[in-house]
């Protein structure tokens, strides 16, 4: 299975190693955005210091230079960063001998002209190239576009429409980076909510329609990746038999159920239910017993790079995760009988206390205590709110009105009302049930919404009454008219792409829902003809031939996905033209890219992993941000708020002038110490001297964001266990 963390790490190291310097000494200067990228790629600073001599934040007051050593700058292309670089060479002696500048995606023409105007940079510039690091690798198969915030507002709030072009360029930069790092030149398909309007638009009969967002991003990406391929003859790689990849671009309107249903996998429950999980930073705050028997406050990262147990556990059903952790605890204790006093062990809580007192197992013990504590919190919230007991109503509503046996439920409201009458679920839980019911019905009148709110105790006098009503109304802005004007109005018409599982003894009753992500990927992997071209048209490259009935059945049998021909790359031959009997077992797996505009839920990310494992394919899924159910409903409620409310970074005054300390004359410092671990010099061709004019082919990207000044401590001074 390909690992996006490893792929991005190797790409970055490759960029660093291609830059040859005297004695192979290199100072790396970064900004806060790149620091965050590095935090997802390198477990310890030493991993990065094997490739460079030192790493510093560009605006750190403790950054020391050396006028005989060359510097590599990997930064966002902002006026502030450019001025900081210029200041490094304005002082005498200059901080560094020469500079190699690598800007992240986002270089606009105005910023490029500003860059060209800097005299000291021009005099000391050794090389200047883009670096394709347009996303954070949050997980081995999930990536997040850089510097996006409130993406649902950007794309669906009419007051924020002016921000769309900037953020489209960010997404395009993210997708191009993905393709460069993976060496893929994908076939592009995009989702369409209204095929009739889409056909008119493609024929030039309509300028704007409901599908313009996905199509515009697909078009912009195609132009950008084609430009990259023209400017880089070695892209895509020629020496591989991997079938051509497929990129599917969708948006948040494709699946309204995924962000609101209660999901019972471990990560989804933790991010939905546990208040002490910081979902923005992927950090869990908790208390645990230490060796002295005292409760101690802890902070742990829930990130793939730091925690192999998290990788194994996060997508398991909570009951399976609990069983796994208990088994691991018992196994650890069983392997160390001489270190354990079993006399007081009566339950799993006692087992956890025993583990806390085990010595010589610090890291394993830390992870077991962490996950046992978090799993217990999830189970506790579930028990207190009776969520699993009520889950059948959600599964039935999202399952087209069918129960676990596949039987159609005649009066589903009779199941909903008892759930709403229960005292254990929170008001927000019940609100999610009501929205699921309205989606199932294709909309209900506002009076019925008010009656249901009153039924759960939210009357006109309730402090959140107007807030909840606004959520119902604002669903119309994301293409779901939940509130019908009249009782006799027809339900809204919507093509559903999610699915439900019935009569399957191998699944939990709480987990029948299949997000649209999983259903779409399942179809396109099995055979592209299974995925409606009407709702998922090809942007450019279309399969070179159609299957006849016999070939279609063969395609279903061998689960090969389609590709299209390309004169550029021989591996772009249609996958189904090779008979299954001739397929080599060692042929690399086809890759599928899936992007959701407007935010993604954790169950949708999990669905991509599930299909990757089931279909034996590499799947990388990305979005602008992760949406928990609470965050999603908050964003929907604010879809009519003015742009000023959100305080977008684009709307804030950005720092331009460099810090004063960078302009002070620096004193010569000692030669670098000889014991620094350096990577042996490679045989890569030297990055030739190039003027800023040589970068004229760089993609235009959005204005970048304000930089913060702080010490480079979060990455370089990170504790080895990432746990306080």
Curated annotation (Swiss-Prot):
InterPro entries: Sec-1-like_dom1, Sec-1-like_dom3a, Sec1-like, Sec1-like_dom2, Sec1-like_sf
Keywords: Protein transport, Transport
Positions of region (Disordered): 675-724
Bias (Polar residues) ranges: 681-692
One GO-annotated biological process of the protein: exocytosis
Quaternary data: Interacts with MSO1.
Family: Belongs to the STXBP/unc-18/SEC1 family.
Further facts: Present with 639 molecules/cell in log phase SD medium.
Protein name as annotated: Protein transport protein SEC1
Organism per entry: Saccharomyces cerevisiae (strain ATCC 204508 / S288c)
Record gene name: SEC1
């Amino acid at each position: 299975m390909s690992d996006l963390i490893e792929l991005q790490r190797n790409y970055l190291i490759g960029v660093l190693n291609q830059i040859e310097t005297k004695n192979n000494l290199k100072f790396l200067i970064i900004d806060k955005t790149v620091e965050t990228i590095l935090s997802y790629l390198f477990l310890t600073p030493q991993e990065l210091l094997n490739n460079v001599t030192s790493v510093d934040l560009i605006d750190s007051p403790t950054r020391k230079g050396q006028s005989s050593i060359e510097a590599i700058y990997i930064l966002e292309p902002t006026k502030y960063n450019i001025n900081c670089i210029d200041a490094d060479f304005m002082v005498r002696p200059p901080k560094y001998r020469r500079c190699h500048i690598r800007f992240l995606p986002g270089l606009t023409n105005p910023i490029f002209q500003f860059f060209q105007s800097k005299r000291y940079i021009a005099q000391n510039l050794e090389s200047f190239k883009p670096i394709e690091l347009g996303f954070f690798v949050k997980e081995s198969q999930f990536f997040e576009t850089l510097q996006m915030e409130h993406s649902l507002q950007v794309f669906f709030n009419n007051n924020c429409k002016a921000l769309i072009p900037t953020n489209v360029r960010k997404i395009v930069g993210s997708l191009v980076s993905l393709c460069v790092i993976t060496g893929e030149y994908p076939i592009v398909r995009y989702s369409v909510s209204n095929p009739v309007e889409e056909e008119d638009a493609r024929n030039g009969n309509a300028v704007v329609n409901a599908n313009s967002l996905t199509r515009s991003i697909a078009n912009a990406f195609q132009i950008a990746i084609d430009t990259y391929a023209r400017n880089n003859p070695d892209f895509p790689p020629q020496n591989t038999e991997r079938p051509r990849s497929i990129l599917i671009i969708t948006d948040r309107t494709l699946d309204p159920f995924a962000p609101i249903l209660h999901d019972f996998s471990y990560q989804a429950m933790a991010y939905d239910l546990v208040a002490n999980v910081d979902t923005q930073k992927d950090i869990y705050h908790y208390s645990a017993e230490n060796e002295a028997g005292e409760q101690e406050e802890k902070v742990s990262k829930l990130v793939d790079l730091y925690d192999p147990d998290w990788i194994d556990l996060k997508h398991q059903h909570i009951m399976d995760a609990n069983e796994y952790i208990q088994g691991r605890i018992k196994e650890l204790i069983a392997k160390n009988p001489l270190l354990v006093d079993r006399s007081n062990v009566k339950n799993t809580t006692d087992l956890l206390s025993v583990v806390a007192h085990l010595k010589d197992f610090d890291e394993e013990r830390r992870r077991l205590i962490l996950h046992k504590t978090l799993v217990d919190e999830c189970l506790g919230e579930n028990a207190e709110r009776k969520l699993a007991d009520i889950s059948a109503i959600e599964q039935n509503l999202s399952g087209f009105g069918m129960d676990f046996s596949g039987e159609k439920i005649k009066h589903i409201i009779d199941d909903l009302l008892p759930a709403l009458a229960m005292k254990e679920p929170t008001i927000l839980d019940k609100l999610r049930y009501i929205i699921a019911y309205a989606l199932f019905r294709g909309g209900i009148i506002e009076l019925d919404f008010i009656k249901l709110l009153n039924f759960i105790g939210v009357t006109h006098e309730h402090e959140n009454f107007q807030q909840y009503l606004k959520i119902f109304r604002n669903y119309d802005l994301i293409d779901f008219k939940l509130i019908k004007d009249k009782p006799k109005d027809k339900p809204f018409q919507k093509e559903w792409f999610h699915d439900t599982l019935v009569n399957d003894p191998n699944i939990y009753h709480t987990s029948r829902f299949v997000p649209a992500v999983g259903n779409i990927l399942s179809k396109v992997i099995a055979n592209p003809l299974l995925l409606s071209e009407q709702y998922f048209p090809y942007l450019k490259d279309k399969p070179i031939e159609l299957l006849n009935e016999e070939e279609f059945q063969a395609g279903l049998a061998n689960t090969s996905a389609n590709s299209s021909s390309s004169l550029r790359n021989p591996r772009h031959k249609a996958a189904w033209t090779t008979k299954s009997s001739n397929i080599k077992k060692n042929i690399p797996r086809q890759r599928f890219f899936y992007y959701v505009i407007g935010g993604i839920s954790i169950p949708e990310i999990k669905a991509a992993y599930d299909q990757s494992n089931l279909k034996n394919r590499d799947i990388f899924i990305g979005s602008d941000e992760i949406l928990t159910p609470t965050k999603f409903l908050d964003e929907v409620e604010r879809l009519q708020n003015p742009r000023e409310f959100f305080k977008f970074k684009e709307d804030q005054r950005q720092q331009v002038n460099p810090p004063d300390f960078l302009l002070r004359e620096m004193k010569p410092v000692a030669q670098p110490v000889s014991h620094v671990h350096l990577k042996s010099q490679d045989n890569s061709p030297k990055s030739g001297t190039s003027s800023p004019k040589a970068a004229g082919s760089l993609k235009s990207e959005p204005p970048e964001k304000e930089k913060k000044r702080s010490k480079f401590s979060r990455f370089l001074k990170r504790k080895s266990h990432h746990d306080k």
